[in-house]
From Swiss-Prot:
Name of the protein this chain belongs to: RNA-binding protein 12
Compositionally biased tracts (Pro residues): 824-838
Record's keyword terms, sorted: Nucleus, Phosphoprotein, Repeat, RNA-binding
Extent of Low complexity compositional bias: 98-116, 717-734
Lineage: Eukaryota, Metazoa, Chordata, Craniata, Vertebrata
């Protein structure tokens, strides 16, 4: 639907193309610009769509030809009414003052006009007069104060540079009121004209030469008087205007003083439009003299260049010139990356500063399919990028040549260097933060990466770890803002075979980070000394190890080292777990040198390792040794039991279930003596065959909280998050038993009627196991256990636990509907001191799930992203917000194709809310994303 916008403040020199250039990038149909003019300089613009009109309204306050314009919503009715009103005003003005255009053919003036002029002998030839007749008639009527002849012939033959206002009704209306005292103005020296008997012989007078003054014309007898005009007080006589140069076409009578509002002489032979001669009042007279030589201001070479950022990689020089259509582009230089491909940035040189000024107005406009940023640039940037400079000698007004400006030495003035070297804390500084540097990176590599940019001496800082290798972080400070912006443009360019992330950072933030890195090194050295002095101290309790699960079974030590690239770790500190046959278990253990490095490894959680998402959990050294002795079994989606080292249930030793634990005292010999199945051991990895997963709750403390409820499917809208797979470890119940599902199954679901293990139909359990059947008293355990279970699950009379094992371990509670405990610990209402009424909920930090009003991580949904978007691009989009490392999850459909959606977890609800408010409808690539 077409939308009409009303524009006010349009200068008189602007045309439809200027308006279209102002709204470049928006769709305006042909014939959609209507200039009305008037006192407010109005125009109406018709946009094709509502979106174009909305974007157009955002440009209110911009400038067209140096004049600020205002945009208002309008309608077609208002536009038509204003156009009709303007047309009527124009027609009325034409009726009052017919134009005396010599080149226009048409009928002679109306009888009313000839009656007012009352010149029957000259009116017939007035429609198409020759230049000589016009001159003669003008001179004759001027000397006899013939007002109408002056207002038509002189206006009709006015030079074109006088503008439209010179012949407007308002301009002509002043002539009758000021022409009567013209006899007081001394004309140029003209000899007296001989008396003529009457006017009829005038056509027979031979033409008089054009050049003024006219020396031979005789005086004309008086003409019949014209109706009286209101008298005007006599004006001060003007000085003789003999010094005024002749006009072309021939001059008419000298302008009276009341016409320009001041008694100062006004030169009409200049190229300025008289509508822009300033306020028309005697208080502010305009002194204009063509003979005065005004020296033009020197042109700063830096005013000719602009920098363009964010262009499409496929953009060519012609696309850049089309983007700046209507402006005089001198040259275009597209910047390349290290392999010669366009990096989306470029420099453009214009012929004049005016073109540069207009080009800067096109910031954030559309080039092909991307919004580009246009910012000022310098000649030094142009030269550094490989652009050529042609020095042209400037011609001054007197014809003297001026040498080309010396720009390069100026940029390296001593004062500038002195300012750049200042280490004042009040200085903002132009610093960048580098991430992803190669481990062997040195200062020379950084200088080569930022080649041709002015770097402050001794400002390159590369962070090194305790092993003496680079950690991949670095800082650089530049001398000026132009080089600083150019450095930011090299974000994600390659240094060697690694792309470098270049992020802006304040000088204060840079110094704080450097100080933090140095303190970390000092603390590490102190920790090393303490470890040497007290090797058995608190080392075992420090979480300096990582347990990596859900990795391919064919993983090698080198694959793990490459996965941990950027974190200092010794090759001997990596252990890939294997079974008795030497086959990989899909797990690895890594021992780091300090807790900081171990915490860094958590950032790699759910990152791809040889095509699979690796789960990284930080554990203590004691836990690592325990895992080495009894590695937990792993299925398709990772561990089925929590890793050791998590909070144990009070009163439950860490034996039967690592991290949650069944008391080994309650299960002597790791078996159930009264089951009737000798040798059917329940291993420490879990209760295989009894429907209990061996590691269903990773780390039991919310280590998997970010994606327990949010997987590849969107939250609350997809299938339940299951833990399919087999139960590793030794068991006597035959083949592995898949655990029940989490979302809709009986895994802590609090739904009665779960089938017993004996007759559940699970593989390897074809017979009704004594003690696990449906009888009420088949299993008699110690006094701490309640009555015999009727169903080994959530049914009545479920397997009881020791006293105090009522409502689950403290601190593991969560909102209803979250991951519950194993089936044996479900909410069975059995008699005795059995399990309590509530399920054991294993969830993330408080407030992470649907419970409201609690601080904690919050997940938002991102939609309408490009299908080719990567996790790094999503993290760059949320740069500056506290995103939980490794929490970005892309969504795929059933065919494995990306859907353009993702889930991102933030460290707090406030951060997530701020991200939604600030970044909603912002573009990633060429598409605007939606945040929920």
């Amino acid at each position: 639907m077409a939308v009409v916008i009303r524009l006010q403040g349009l200068p008189i020199v602007a045309g439809t193309m200027d308006i279209r250039h102002f709204f470049s990038g928006l769709t305006i149909p042909d014939g959609g610009v209507h200039i009305v003019g008037g006192e407010l300089g109005e125009a109406f613009i018709v946009f094709a769509t509502d979106e174009d009109a909305r974007l157009g309204m955002m440009r209110t306050g911009g400038t067209i030809k140096g004049s600020k314009v205002t945009l208002l919503l309008s309608s077609k009715t208002e536009m038509q009414n204003m156009i009709e009103l303007s047309r009527r005003r124009f027609e009325t003005a034409n009726l009052d003052i017919p134009p005396a255009n010599a080149s226009r053919s048409g009928p002679p003036p109306s009888s009313g006009m000839s009656g007012r002029v009352n010149l029957p002998t000259t009116v017939s030839n007035f429609n198409n007069p020759s230049p000589s007749v016009v001159t003669a008639t003008t001179s004759v009527h001027e000397s006899n104060k013939n007002i109408q002849t002056f207002s038509t012939a002189s206006v009709g033959t006015a030079p074109p540079n006088m503008g439209a206002s010179f012949g407007s009704p308002a301009f002509s209306s002043t002539v009758p009121s000021t022409a009567s005292p013209m006899n007081t103005v001394p004309p140029p020296p003209i000899p007296p004209i001989p008396a003529m008997p009457s006017l009829p012989p005038m056509p027979s007078i031979p033409p008089i030469p054009v050049p003024p003054p006219v020396p031979t014309l005789p005086p004309v007898p008086p003409v019949p008087p014209i109706p009286p005009v209101p008298s005007v007080p006599p004006m001060t006589p003007l000085p003789p205007m003999s010094g005024m140069p002749p006009l072309n076409p021939p001059p008419v009578a000298p302008l009276p003083a009341g016409m320009n509002g001041s008694g100062a002489p006004m030169n009409l032979n200049n190229n300025l439009n008289p509508m822009f001669l300033g306020p028309l009042n005697p208080v502010n007279p305009i002194q204009m003299n063509s003979q005065s030589s005004v020296k033009p201001l020197p042109i700063n070479p830096d005013d000719l260049y602009v920098s363009v950022h964010g262009m499409p990689f496929s953009a060519m020089e012609n696309d850049v010139r089309d983007f700046f259509h209507g402006l005089r582009v001198d040259a275009v230089h597209l910047l390349k990356d290290h392999v010669g491909r366009n990096n989306g940035n470029g420099l453009v040189k214009f012929l004049s500063p005016q073109d540069t000024f207009e080009a800067l107005k096109r910031n954030r406009m559309l080039m092909i399919q991307r919004y580009v940023e246009v910012s000022p640039a310098t000649e030094r940037q142009w030269v550094a990028a490989g652009g050529h400079i042609t020095f042209k000698q400037n011609m001054g007004p007197s014809g003297q040549t001026h040498p080309p400006p010396q720009t390069l030495p100026r940029s390296k003035s001593p004062s500038g260097q002195k300012r750049s070297r200042s280490r004042s804390p009040h200085e903002a500084g132009f610093c960048v933060y580098l991430k992803g540097l190669p481990f062997e990176a040195e200062n020379k590599h950084v200088i080569d990466f930022f080649k041709k940019l002015d770097i402050v001496e001794d400002s390159i800082y590369i962070a090194y770890g305790p092993n003496g290798k680079a950690t991949g972080e670095g800082f650089v400070e530049f001398r000026n803002e132009a080089d600083y912006k150019a450095a930011l443009c090299r974000h994600k360019q390659y240094m060697g075979n690694r792309f470098i992330q270049v992020h802006p950072i304040t000088k204060k933030g840079m110094l704080e980070k450097i100080d933090m890195i140095r303190k970390r090194l000092q603390n590490f050295s102190y920790d090393q000394r303490e470890m040497i002095l007290n090797p058995e101290g608190d080392v075992n309790s420090a979480k300096v190890c990582a347990h990596i699960t859900n990795i391919p079974f064919s993983i090698t030590k080198m694959d793990v080292l490459q996965f941990l690239e950027g974190i200092p770790v010794d090759e001997n500190a990596v252990h890939v777990l294997v079974d008795n046959n030497g086959q990989g278990l899909g797990q690895a253990l890594v021992q780091f040198k300090n807790e900081d490095d171990a915490r860094k490894s958590e950032r790699l959680h759910r990152k791809k390792l040889n095509g699979r998402e690796a789960f990284v959990h930080v554990v203590t050294l004691e836990d690592m040794r325990e895992i080495e002795k009894n590695p937990p079994a792993q299925g398709k989606k990772g561990l089925k039991m929590p890793v050791p080292g998590n909070p144990a249930v009070p009163g439950m030793p860490n034996a039967g279930l690592p991290g949650v634990g069944l008391p080994s005292a309650g299960l002597p010999g790791a078996g159930l003596p009264s089951t009737g199945l000798p040798g059917s051991a329940i291993t420490s990895a879990g209760l295989p065959g009894a429907g209990m997963p061996s590691a269903g709750i990773p780390s039991a403390g919310g280590e998997e909280h970010a994606f327990l409820t949010v997987g590849s499917k969107e939250a609350n809208n997809g299938p339940p998050f299951n833990f399919p797979g087999n139960f590793g470890g030794s068991n006597a119940f035959g083949p592995p038993i898949p655990p029940p599902g989490l979302g809709g199954g009986a895994f802590g679901d609090a739904r009665p009627g779960m089938p017993s293990v004996g007759n559940s139909g699970l593989p390897g359990l074809g017979l009704d196991v004594p003690g696990f059947g449906g009888g009420p008293n088949n299993l008699s355990g110690p006094s701490g256990f309640g009555g015999g279970p009727q169903n080994f699950g959530n049914g009545p009379g479920s397997l009881g636990g020791p006293p105090g094992f009522g409502s689950g371990p403290p601190g593991l509670g969560s909102a209803p509907g979250h991951l519950g405990g194993p089936p044996a610990f479900g909410p069975g209402p059995g008699p005795g001191p059995g399990p309590g009424p509530g399920p054991i909920h294993i969830g993330g930090p408080p407030g992470f799930a649907s419970s409201s009003g609690k601080p904690g991580p919050t997940v938002i949904k991102v939609q309408n992203m490009p299908f080719t978007v990567s996790i790094d691009e999503i993290l760059d989009f949320f740069y500056g917000y506290q995103v939980i490392p490794g929490s970005v999850c892309l969504k795929y459909n059933e065919k494995g194709m990306p859907t353009g959606e993702a889930m991102v977890a933030f460290e707090s609800r406030d951060e997530a809310t701020a991200a939604v408010i600030d970044l909603n409808d912002r573009p990633i690539g060429s598409r605007k994303v939606n945040l929920y």
